[in-house]
């Protein structure tokens, strides 16, 4: 498999930001994920449009004053999971996970996603992310001004974006 050009730069920028501000490590993954027990998040550079739309619909309705790229929202939401993980007892986490597993039976995409975003851990992770981005606008802007050009450079170097 060919090496992806520019990935180390992206990883370094993200990890500098997440370690410095939250004590959390980050690495490339198949999707945005939180591994709260190990204070680690996964990020991706390829997100399905439908996922973006459902998530942003919820996040922007709750935080219309936050004008952030979907990448920032997803990343900060996963950080939010790690930062709010100690809110829940093990029994509560089990109930939340049980509720989420039942959502796969809901056929209507919009309803399933609406219910997903009302799960306490999802709700609190998004709330944490929105509040943090409001309170730390300069930090998030500085991070975005570093990561966005690195991502665009990555796309160009790997011929994922023809300009």
Annotated model-derived regions:
Residues 1-5:
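Short Lys/Arg-rich cationic patches that frequently serve as NLS/NoLS or arginine-rich RNA/DNA-binding motifs
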Residues 6-21:
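Zn2+-dependent metallopeptidase catalytic core
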Residues 25-69, 79-86:
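Active-site scaffold of zinc-dependent metalloenzymes
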Residues 67-69, 108-163:
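Long, well-structured alpha-helical subdomains associated
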Residues 75:
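A conserved beta-strand element that flanks and buttresses the S-adenosyl-L-methionine
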Residues 85-122:
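Post-HEXXH active-site segment of zinc metalloproteases
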């Amino acid at each position: 498999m060919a090496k992806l050009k520019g990935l180390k730069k992206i990883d370094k920028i993200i990890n500098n930001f997440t370690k410095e501000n939250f004590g959390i490590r980050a690495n490339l993954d198949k999707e945005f994920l939180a591994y709260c027990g190990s204070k680690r998040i996964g990020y991706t550079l390829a997100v399905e449009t439908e996922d973006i739309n459902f998530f942003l619909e919820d996040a922007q309705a709750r935080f219309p004053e936050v004008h952030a790229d979907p990448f920032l929202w997803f990343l900060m939401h996963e950080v939010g999971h790690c930062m709010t993980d100690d809110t829940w007892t093990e029994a509560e986490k089990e109930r939340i996970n049980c509720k989420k597993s039942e959502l796969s039976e809901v056929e209507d995409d919009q309803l399933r996603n609406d219910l997903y975003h009302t799960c306490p851990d999802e709700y609190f992770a998004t709330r944490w992310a929105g509040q943090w981005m409001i309170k730390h606008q300069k930090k998030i802007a500085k991070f975005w001004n570093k990561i966005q050009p690195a991502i665009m450079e990555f796309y160009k170097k790997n011929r994922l974006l023809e300009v």
